[in-house]
């Protein structure tokens, strides 16, 4: 029944290779797709313990659910740096500004929108090194942002529609 509804019931993995960029070498990623449904929480929690980074997928129409908050707490417990992808933004009722307010209200001001033009002020409020760079140069340095993400001070938020491959480029780069 879960499979018929498209619910992941076991963790699955895929190996992805991102091509080299002018400023980065080719990158190999191991993607673990874990169950998002509350009935399979134990399976998801086992996978969280081995992650270097996580992408927490949230519905653009439904927003943060109770189980999403449980996953968020587990990601914090295991200190997993987390990116947020708000999916289904192509559907009626999906509103990026509403979702960002909700994310900040539930998960903190470290949730910063990364899809459109950068907001240096929002990023600066997440860590002292980011603040210093924004005050000095108007923009935080890339490496400083990466460090803030790794330390779970910044949680980059991306918006798109995964089935249409919309919004994924920014997330992957």
Feature names for model-found ranges:
Residues 1-62, 66, 71:
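Conserved P-loop/Walker A NTP-binding site and adjacent catalytic elements of P-loop NTPases
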Residues 60-173:
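P-loop NTPase catalytic nucleotide-binding module
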């Amino acid at each position: 029944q879960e499979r018929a509804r498209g619910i992941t019931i076991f963790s699955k993995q895929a190996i992805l290779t991102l091509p080299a960029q002018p400023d980065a070498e080719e990158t190999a990623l191991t993607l673990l797709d874990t169950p998002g449904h509350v009935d399979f929480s134990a399976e998801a929690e086992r996978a969280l313990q081995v992650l270097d980074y996580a992408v927490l997928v949230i519905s653009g129409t439904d927003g943060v659910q109770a189980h999403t908050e449980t996953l968020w707490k587990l990601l914090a417990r295991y200190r997993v740096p987390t990116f947020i992808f708000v999916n289904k933004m192509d559907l009626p009722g999906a509103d990026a500004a509403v979702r960002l307010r909700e994310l900040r209200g539930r998960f903190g001001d470290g949730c910063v929108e990364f899809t459109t033009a950068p907001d240096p002020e929002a990023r600066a409020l997440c860590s002292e090194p980011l603040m210093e760079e924004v005050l000095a140069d108007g923009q935080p340095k890339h490496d400083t942002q990466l460090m803030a993400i790794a330390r779970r001070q910044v949680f980059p938020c991306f918006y798109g529609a995964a089935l249409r491959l919309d919004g994924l480029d920014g997330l992957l780069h």
